[in-house]
Amino acid sequence: MAGKPLRCISVGKLKTPFWKDAAAHYLTRIKRWRHLEYTEVRDGDAALPPDQRNALEGRRIVEALAPQDVALVLDEHGQKLSSPQLAALLRRLDQEARGRACFVVGGAWGLDDSVRQRAFKVLSLSDMTLPHELARVVLLEQIYRAECILRKVPYHH
């Protein structure tokens, strides 16, 4: 059973080798079952104040979203889901949504409100603030875990 294609949009490129390796590891595992398109939008100029940088990055994210994308935006103040709940959400979107699920990870300074307003759901990975590079890897691991749950593959305990 292949689910609908997924998409992830994030700000900036992974620069640190171990984050790149970890992301590639989970992308390879996910792609056994489901196509996942990963889009990196250019981050804002570091010389800009954080609010202006967020606004610029927010515009780039919103422009990168296709009209039919079902945006699942990651934000520290979002709804927390267990891994089985994320799997159930992906199953529901596979069955009911017209577009593909598109996870959105902001940059080092978070997200502009315009991105949250475009969201179908705003989700949180943790009560703790995570570096955006780590958040990307955690998200990919959770997508892989959700796929294992949906397929009853022994990975989630």
From Swiss-Prot:
Main location: cytoplasm
InterPro entries: Alpha/beta_knot_MTases (IPR029028), RlmH-like (IPR003742), tRNA_m1G_MTases_N (IPR029026)
Entry EC no(s): 2.1.1.177
Subcellular location field: Cytoplasm
SUPFAM superfamilies assigned to the protein according to its UniProt record, in alphabetical order: alpha/beta knot
UniProt keyword terms in alphabetical order: Cytoplasm, Methyltransferase, rRNA processing, S-adenosyl-L-methionine, Transferase
Keyword Hydrolase: no
Pfam families linked: SPOUT_MTase
Claim: Methyltransferase is one of the keywords in the record: yes
Enzyme category, top tier: transferase
Catalytic reactions of this protein: pseudouridine(1915) in 23S rRNA + S-adenosyl-L-methionine = N(3)-methylpseudouridine(1915) in 23S rRNA + S-adenosyl-L-homocysteine + H(+)
GO cellular component: cytoplasm
GO molecular function, one term: rRNA (pseudouridine-N3-)-methyltransferase activity
Residues noted as binding S-adenosyl-L-methionine in the record, renumbered to the chain: L74, G106, L125, S126, D127, M128, T129, L130
Family: Belongs to the RNA methyltransferase RlmH family.
HAMAP family found in the cross-reference section: 23SrRNA_methyltr_H
Name of this chain's protein: Ribosomal RNA large subunit methyltransferase H
Organism expressing this protein natively: Desulfovibrio desulfuricans (strain ATCC 27774 / DSM 6949 / MB)
